[in-house]
Amino acid sequence: MKKRGVLCEEEKEVKKRKLLEQIGDGHLPYLSSKDDTFYDLWGSCYSKLTLLQAKHVPVDLHHTVQNAFLSLLRNGCLFQDLVRLKGKDIITPVSRILIGRPGYTYKYLNTRLFAVPWINDELNTQYSTRNLLETYKAFSDLNDFLYSQTVNELQKLGKIHKDNFFQHSEYKEQIKSDQRPSTSNYENVKLHSMESFNVTLINYMDPQNMSFLKEEPYFGMGKMAVSWHHDENLVEQSTVAVYNYSYQESSNDVNGEDEDPTRWHVGLKIAWDIETPGLLMPLSSGDCYLMLDDLNKTHQHCVIAGCQPRFSSTHRVAESSTGTLQYIKSQCNSALQNLHMNPDTGAADLKNLEPNVLGQTEEIHNEVEFEWLRQFWFQGKRYNKCTTFWKEAMTELEIHWKQMETMTSLVLKAIENENLTVDEKCNILKNILPPLVERQDLRHDWRERCRSKLAKMLPPDQVPCFYPYWNDDNKTMPLPFDLHNIISALQKTLEENELKL
């Protein structure tokens, strides 16, 4: 699987500034459903956006999913994330929880969310209450439904694009009635993203509790709950499916008027394009929309806030090559292959002093510490409310990490060994110093993030924990937490040995 290429933040900022300069003091045009050419624009420029109206979703599924949303809210299982954007920490206005396949994670804005497992009969996962078990099962059922709808829509889309047999007038009517053109002789059409969604990111926001929401800057669509973006870290050309639920709806919402300002909307635009009008699609409670195939890559989307609290369940195929518990455990096992433990004495030794092997081990050491342990504990004790799965997983990963601390100490002892040649010492130092310097720098960065004013503003169970951390007098740890003196000594040793070559 291939990760969608993401522009670096600097490139995005340049493009954004250029776009705003081109717009000047005005706004770009956009169409909403009140405009006569709305459906023509949808069919010609946004054809990979599909709306599944609430009336076409099974009633019992509506009931269980909407109750599940409220259950998450009542049980305090929706959390604002302390994320990093453009080098600065911010608290998200939207509260979230990730639910999905056991052991899966999803990373956004330098924050790794850990999926609370949806029901798996083969997994002995403990949930804090029976009620939450049913809650997670509801999103698993919704996932199955949205996947089946996605497969159907991709099949229709593939046939449409292949034969181009319909006219815009027909297309307009079929969008209005929530029916896409189809044929009975569909076969052998290449489809993208047939893999099932592996996670869903649940979002909740009550705009009445938000003191400030930014105005949408390009089109003047309204106040944004979520600004323009591509969903990141997804499998390339994979569909994103969204279930929308606004509750405590006013009588104004029931009449179905598209221009009712209390309604929520999703906005779409072609990325960095000022020629094509934007599209603003109204959402009724219970509606689902699918961003099919490569739409998430070629277009950007935003969410325009209504007046009522809103939940959404956003189902996606997260890029999982380096984001699963199975993956990081495999990495640990690979690194620990070089560690020998004497079964009689318990003494530890390294099997191999090959510089590349030692360097790779230190890189895995960093990966476990900063992509998993510190990411998990930076989110406080929030997961205790949801499941024991990740606490147990982190306990196991911490054991492996401590073994790698031992391996680092053994490398340092080996460098002091006079049996190594000058060339061997230099090669080892050149391979281990970069990850050690990175470790020292990242430990400092994570400490500062945990001490920030924003971190202290979070609820007690969500306040970041700076962990792992230990004092120099901790005899259970083979190395000090602060590696400054060790790194300085190693750099000096490298310089001295290079002079001997």
Curated annotation (Swiss-Prot):
It comes from the Eukaryota. The gene is fto. It is an enzyme of class 1 (oxidoreductase). Monomer. May also exist as homodimer. The lineage of its organism: Eukaryota, Metazoa, Chordata, Craniata, Vertebrata. This is Alpha-ketoglutarate-dependent dioxygenase FTO. GO terms for cellular component: cytoplasm; nuclear speck; nucleus. It comes from Xenopus laevis (African clawed frog). The keyword Cytoplasm applies. Activated by ascorbate. Inhibited by N-oxalylglycine, fumarate and succinate.
